[in-house]
Amino acid sequence: MRILHMNAGAEDGGGKTHIISLLDQFPTGEVELAVFEDGIVAKEARELGIKVHVFSQKSRYDLSILKNISEFINNEKFDIVHTHGPRANFYVSLMKKRITAKWVTTIHSDPFEDFTKQGLKGWIFTKLNLKALKNIDLFFVVTNRLKKSLAALGISNEKMHVIYNGIEYDKEKAEGYNKKEMFNIDEDVFTAIQVARLHPVKGHEVLFDALQRTKLEKIKVLLVGDGPLKENLKSLATEKGINNKVEFLGHRQDVKQLFASSHVNLLTSHSEGFPLVLLEAANQRVPSIVTRAGEIEPLIVDETYGWIVPTDDGRALALALEEAYDKWKTGELAAMGKHIYEHAIMNFSLQKLYEDTKETYKQLIAKNL
C-alpha cells in the first residue's frame, strides 16, 4: 500500500494536527506527503521522519506544477492520493484523468462555508471547490452533519465514510504557567482560552460581544492564533472597550501549557466539523464552551461535559461564561474537565482514527468500495 497525502502546506491548527498525527501512525514507506508550500506542515512532517515532496508554485494560481505532480504520482505507483483542503482538491480534479491512483479526501468543514465572508474571491473559490468534490472516489467526513452538505452536491452515501477525529492523550496534564509572571494575570482572574485562526469563520466578534456584555470583571481570554483579521480584531477590541479582557498571543508552540493554564476553553465559530481543539482542551482536563457550529454533541453529551450555545449569540455566550465562572469558584469546573477527558479518551482516539482509515484504504484498493 502506497498513499500520498496532499495539502497546500500552509495549514495550521486542527487541519495540520490531523494530517501530521495521522501520517505518523503509518509504517515507514506506506505514506508520503506532497505540499505546495514548504511551510509548517512540511517542517513538522520532516521532524517525524515522514517523507515530504515540495511542488513549489510562483503563486497559488500557478498550475505549471500539475504535469510534474501527475507524473510523480504515476511513476511512484501510489495506490491512493488523499487530499486535504480546497487547493489540493482543485489541483487533483484537474489531474484526475491523468493519474492511475484512486482519489480520497477528508472533509474537515462545511465546503459551502470554507470561504465565508471573503467576497467575490470567496464565491469563486467555493464554486471551484464544490465542482472538484464531484470527481472524488471516496470521502472521509469528520461528522454525520457534513454528509448532508455533500449529499446536497449529489454525492452518494456509499462514497462517504464518517470517521471522527482523534488524538493521543496524556496520562498527566501539562504543567501550567505562573500566569502572573508570564502574562501579568492574577490568580483570582478567571482565565479562558480560544485557540483558533484569526479568520472570519471563527467568530471572534461573537466572543468580543460576549465580553462586552458579561458582568464578569476579573476575566482574561488568551487568544492563540494568527490570521488575516489580526489588526481588525485588535481594533474591534479597542472599540468595544475590552482590551483589558483579551491577550493576543499569536501562533504558539506551547498550546498544551496554555490550556493547562486556563479554566475553560472557547470556540465561537460560525462553521465547524468536529473540532480537534476540543479534544486538545479535554486532554488537559479543560471543559469547553462552544457554538453549535458543528457536530459537537458526541463529545459534549450534556451539561456535565460543557456548554453548547447558539451561533452568533453573544448574550448566550456571556451567560455560559458566567456559569463557568460560578462553577470554577465551587470547584465543579475542574470536575467537568476530568469528566470530558475520560469521555474523550474512550471515544476519540488517534489509534481508532488510524485503524478506520487504513481499513478503508484497503477496501478501496481492493475495489470493494
Per-segment meaning from a language model:
Residues 13-21, 190-213, 228-235, 276, ...:
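A conserved mid-protein helix/loop that constitutes part of the nucleotide-sugar donor-binding site
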Residues 172-185, 330, 337:
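A short helix/loop element that forms part of the nucleotide-sugar donor recognition site in Leloir-type
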Residues 34, 287-290, 300:
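Short hydrophobic beta-strand element within catalytic cores of glycosyltransferases
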Residues 63-67, 102, 112-132:
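Nucleotide-sugar donor phosphate/pyrophosphate-binding loop at the beta->alpha transition
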Residues 251, 270:
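Aromatic "clamp/platform" in nucleotide-sugar-dependent glycosyltransferases that forms part
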Residues 83-89, 107:
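Short His-centered aromatic/hydrophobic patch
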